[in-house]
C-alpha cells in the first residue's frame, strides 16, 4: 500500500514537472538571432515610415564580437535597406517585394535586444548619398561640354 502511494505521488510529480516544462518556454526559444532582430527593425522602420514604398534589407553588417549572450542587453546593429516596388499600404511582406530599380538606399544604425518577447529596437535610417549616380552624371556632363566647347568657345573644361 505504501509503495502504491509513493508510486502515485511520484507519477503526479512527474506529470506536474512535464506540464510545467511544456508551459514555460525555454530561454533559447525566446532569444532572436541577430538577423531576426534586424528584420524586426526593418519591419518597424516600414511601419513608422511616411515613405511611399516599403524598404527591404539589402545588406547586413556582421554582428559585433561580444561575449555577453544576455538577450536583454542592447546589441549594436548596422545595415542597409533599399526601396522596393511595393507600396507601403500593401499587406505584402517586404521580403516578398522586388527591389525598385534605382530605389533609395538607406544606412541604418542603432541597437536591438534579442529578447523575442520584450525586444527593444532603437534604430535610425538615413539616406545614403548616391555617389554612383553623381559620377555617371558628371561624366556625361563633361562629355557633352567637350563636344560643345569647339562650338561655343567660352565653354572649356579642363
From Swiss-Prot:
Keyword Disulfide bond recorded: yes
GO BP field: antimicrobial humoral immune response mediated by antimicrobial peptide; defense response to fungus; defense response to Gram-negative bacterium; defense response to Gram-positive bacterium; innate immune response; killing of cells of another organism
Family: Belongs to the cathelicidin family.
Protein purpose: Exerts a potent antimicrobial activity against Gram-negative and Gram-positive bacteria, including methicillin-resistant Staphylococcus aureus, and fungi.
Secreted keyword on record: yes
Swiss-Prot/TrEMBL keywords: Antibiotic, Antimicrobial, Disulfide bond, Fungicide, Secreted, Signal
Gene label: CATHL6
Pro-peptide positions on chain: 30-131
Origin superkingdom: Eukaryota
Protein name, UniProt field: Cathelicidin-6
Organism (species): Bos taurus (Bovine)
Residues spanning the signal sequence: 1-29
Pfam family, one: Cathelicidins
Localization annotation: Secreted
GO terms of molecular function: lipopolysaccharide binding
Disulfide bonds, paired cysteine numbers: 86-97, 108-125
Annotated GO CC locations: extracellular space
Amino acid at each position: 500500500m505504501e509503495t502504491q502511494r509513493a508510486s502515485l505521488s511520484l507519477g503526479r510529480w512527474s506529470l506536474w514537472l512535464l506540464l510545467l516544462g511544456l508551459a514555460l518556454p525555454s530561454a533559447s526559444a525566446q532569444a532572436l538571432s541577430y538577423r531576426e532582430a534586424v528584420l524586426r527593425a526593418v519591419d518597424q522602420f516600414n511601419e513608422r515610415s511616411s515613405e511611399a514604398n516599403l524598404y527591404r534589407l539589402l545588406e547586413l553588417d556582421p554582428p559585433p564580437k561580444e561575449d555577453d549572450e544576455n538577450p536583454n542587453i542592447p546589441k549594436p546593429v548596422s545595415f542597409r535597406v533599399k526601396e522596393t516596388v511595393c507600396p507601403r499600404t500593401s499587406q505584402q511582406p517586404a521580403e516578398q517585394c522586388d527591389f525598385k530599380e534605382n530605389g533609395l538606399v538607406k544606412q541604418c544604425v542603432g541597437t536591438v535586444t534579442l529578447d523575442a518577447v520584450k525586444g527593444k529596437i532603437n534604430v535610425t535610417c538615413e539616406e545614403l548619398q548616391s555617389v554612383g549616380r553623381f559620377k555617371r552624371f558628371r561624366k556625361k556632363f563633361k562629355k557633352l561640354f567637350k563636344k560643345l566647347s569647339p562650338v561655343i568657345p567660352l565653354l572649356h573644361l579642363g
